[in-house]
Amino acid sequence: MPRTGLSKDVILKAFQELSDALVKQNVKGELCLFGGTVMVLAYSARVSTKDVDAIFQPAAIIRDAAAQIGNERDLPPDWLNDGVKGFISAKHDVVQGNLPQFPNLRLTMPTPEYLLAMKCMASRINPAESQEGDVRDIIFLIRHLKLGNAADVMRMVAEYYPPDRIPIKAQYLVQALFEEGKI
């Protein structure tokens, strides 16, 4: 697997193969995509992502098909994973957006507000922790949503997560982005 990660083309080909596998089993599947995959597919804000974070149904069938596709395409073993499920908000706002759809595979994603809240909750700034860190994605989403100040951003995060669970590093990061003129 190249160090550049999963490009839009690689992801879409893998999703087509996943849909084809579901057709053969006469099963309809759904992936709710998160993180870098949404930034690549829906917003073209990145050229690649290290993996596809998603929650999916039917989980066992999709997991098995994804493992086979990964082996055939020389993708990382966890190219499609549900590690994000521990970060899902009780206010789970998802849309189809402009994501491509496949015959037996429906794709959804969080609203931009929800995705921004998730990115702020993670607030990964070290590229070793996340392919590019979350900072670029946070900047992109704040601009996309036309939010004018850090307080507006943090109010939005609090719509999705209890205020006492919002990491202080998220508040400092967002404040610094505005103070440094990056927004």
Model-inferred region functions:
Residues 1-183:
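Compositionally biased terminal segments of proteins
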